[in-house]
């Protein structure tokens, strides 16, 4: 369902991005130096379609995002832009780097967005500077408590009937207990997902802020993963702590150049 939405919006709006932050505000330029903009070019069946996702830098050549962003029917080519604020402009701060390959957990399933996480390996290392920096992510024993307010940024749409934002927007959302997500998503898994959102429905991400980090206390705890149609509440984010050992292992493999070619499922 989400996949179809993503693809159909990509057909209509090649550059608009598959997601939207609603009820947020523009961030101070370069105050989120870990943010990555993913431009995803569909190569098959037609090469004229493209869409975008969010992501975040966790190593000089490593970006985390949502697996469903790169798992489309047909192959895709991914380019990451770091150091961006206004994505419609080629800012001097921007570093545009092609993605060499990526890896998803062996048990990733696009049906229900189970294990919706991907680690992208960049072709060249990013130059770390004041506009481009890594962010730490939560350890396997770290959890944020229900009620904690964390922030999520993206270049998605700013209204349901709106358009993509060219500047980076951010919204604060609360960690919820699992109940609203269990009710709405039959395959909600509390160990690997987190339930997030604004109960009043005034503030939200949509699916194409997909891949962006849910940041609590300067650390990434979640990855924007799924929602239902235009419903603003609740949203399911991938729980990073569950995947921490897997991420560390993949980073070691990146360093050793041992990864199989992408797309891969190891
Ligand atoms: C993927 O695309 C092919 C070719 O267009 C089509 O035959 C197939 O049904 C599609 N699969 C899914 C899951 O949409
Ligand atoms: C982003 O850049 C474009 C192109 O220069 C400009 O038209 C637009 O107003 C800018 N957006 C914002 C919010 O400053």
Residue locations for each model-derived region?
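Extracytoplasmic
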Residues: 31-33, 73-77, 94, 115-117, ...
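Conserved H-D interstitial segment of serine endopeptidase catalytic domains
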Residues: 15, 19-21, 38-41, 63-66, ...
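Active-site substrate-binding loop(s) of clan PA
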Residues: 91, 103-109, 125-165
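Conserved beta strand-loop-helix elements of the APE1-like EEP
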Residues: 118-124
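Conserved beta-strand elements of beta-rich interaction domains across eukaryotes
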Residues: 43, 62-63, 69-70, 85-87, ...
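Protease-domain processing segments flanking chymotrypsin-fold serine proteases, especially trypsin-like
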Residues: 1-64, 72, 78-79, 84, ...
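Extracellular trypsin-like serine protease catalytic domains
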Residues: 35-45, 148-266
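Extracellular/periplasmic catalytic domains that process cell-envelope and extracellular macromolecules
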Residues: 27-31, 57, 72-74, 110-113, ...
